[in-house]
């Protein structure tokens, strides 16, 4: 898994 994807996913969840 690419860290960038993980960071993006976490960022979106935090944005919710």
Curated annotation (Swiss-Prot):
Q: Record's Gene Ontology CC terms?
A: extracellular region
Q: What are the alphabetically sorted keywords of the record?
A: Amidation, Amphibian defense peptide, Antibiotic, Antimicrobial, Secreted
| GO biological process: one example | defense response to Gram-positive bacterium
Query: Where does the entry say this protein is expressed, by tissue?
Result: Expressed by the skin glands.
Q: Where are residues bearing Leucine amide located in the sequence?
A: 16
Q: Subcellular location, in the record's words? A: Secreted
Q: Does the keyword Secreted apply?
A: yes
- The cysteines covalently paired via disulfide bonds are none
Protein purpose: Has antibacterial activity against the Gram-positive bacterium L.lactis (MIC=25 uM). Lacks antibacterial activity against the Gram-negative bacteria E.cloacae and E.coli, and against the Gram-positive bacteria B.cereus, E.faecalis, L.innocua, M.luteus, S.aureus, S.epidermidis and S.uberis. Does not inhibit the formation of NO by neuronal nitric oxide synthase.
In Swiss-Prot or TrEMBL terms, this protein is called Riparin-2.1
Organism of provenance: Crinia riparia (Streambank froglet)
């Amino acid at each position: 898994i690419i860290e960038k994807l993980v960071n993006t996913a976490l960022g979106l969840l935090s944005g919710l």
